């Protein structure tokens, strides 16, 4: 689910935090990609040009086709992807998972009704709702990535949290996902639509964590509370509080505890046994692997291994697979080109460092004004009188 209404809220109140770019503008960047989100996109995507979507046994292969060709496209544009796979969901997510199971049952009933009625549009619509990424899909994708020479990371828990940890550690530039909660986990950059097909012609949307905090006039802790009020995967939200009211409450009271002390109970009903504190801690201290211990390496592809894996039962065109392998090799050789800013190490930003820089700038400005005042006011010269 991500965070309900967050994207629009940022667009309305902190538009400077969003930048649209072409994919080529991320040349030389390392990006952590939410693998499950990608696989879901690939599984529901409508394929054209006579592409094979299943094995001889009828098992889907669209997730492998998508992973293969989209990854090649990223590498063609000088982007180094690392895919991050979900681990076990946190216990607090069980409520959201139960809701998804209910929606799945409803979709199954609706699909049967659409099938009985011969409603082709309805059949397609509800079939898409029933798609889910399985462990087998993920394992096949990992095997494919290994053969392509592209690294992946198994997150102990949420992939978005692990992506954010890689960004904060300086291992990668950004998190690529459609789920906005990567920002709630503290990813300093979020890229949306990066793995969309070229045919959709969607510019990549880059969200800046620092600029959104500045635009919303809140700090990182307050941003987490805002996201909980908007609606997240870990607890219920307060019915009747939409995005506009949520940011007003955060700006007025700064945290959920104070909001609850001042909330009009005749207008809003707080969920019983509301686990907002546990949800907050999940965002502040998520279960992630230590990013410093993760070694990311992009190596040469195994062309023969790719042919063996994708052709045969999976029915990929050998010619296209070999052409793809050659593109991978070419991209690997071109990786010697680097961005100019890669020569300068960027240290992870911290609130203390930012505040110190601001204080230093203010002190320098104050010192300059004092000198100016002394120069213009001293000795009876023709300088301007101090105001």
UniProtKB/Swiss-Prot annotation:
One Gene Ontology term of the molecular function aspect: 5'-flap endonuclease activity
> Which EC number applies?
3.1.-.-
Q: Describe its PTM?
A: Phosphorylated. Phosphorylation upon DNA damage induces relocalization to the nuclear plasma.
Q: Which UniProt keywords apply?
A: DNA damage, DNA repair, DNA replication, Endonuclease, Exonuclease, Hydrolase, Magnesium, Metal-binding, Mitochondrion, Nuclease, Nucleus, Phosphoprotein
Top EC group = hydrolase
Pfam families, alphabetized: XPG_I, XPG_N
Q: How is the cofactor bound?
A: Binds 2 magnesium ions per subunit. They probably participate in the reaction catalyzed by the enzyme. May bind an additional third magnesium ion after substrate binding.
For the region N-domain, what residue ranges are annotated?
1-104
Start and end residues of each stretch annotated as I-domain: 122-253
Region described as Disordered: 345-387
The entry's cellular-component GO terms read:
mitochondrion; nucleolus; nucleoplasm
Q: What cofactors does the UniProt entry give for this protein?
A: Mg(2+)
Recorded coiled-coil stretches:
none
What GO terms in the biological process aspect are recorded for it? Answer: base-excision repair; DNA replication, removal of RNA primer
Keyword Calcium assigned to the entry: answer is no
Q: Which PANTHER family match?
A: FLAP ENDONUCLEASE 1, FLAP ENDONUCLEASE FAMILY MEMBER
Subunit structure, as described in the record = Interacts with PCNA. Three molecules of FEN1 bind to one PCNA trimer with each molecule binding to one PCNA monomer. PCNA stimulates the nuclease activity without altering cleavage specificity.
The entry's function note states: Structure-specific nuclease with 5'-flap endonuclease and 5'-3' exonuclease activities involved in DNA replication and repair. During DNA replication, cleaves the 5'-overhanging flap structure that is generated by displacement synthesis when DNA polymerase encounters the 5'-end of a downstream Okazaki fragment. It enters the flap from the 5'-end and then tracks to cleave the flap base, leaving a nick for ligation. Also involved in the long patch base excision repair (LP-BER) pathway, by cleaving within the apurinic/apyrimidinic (AP) site-terminated flap.
* Name of the protein this chain belongs to: Flap endonuclease 1
The species is Drosophila yakuba
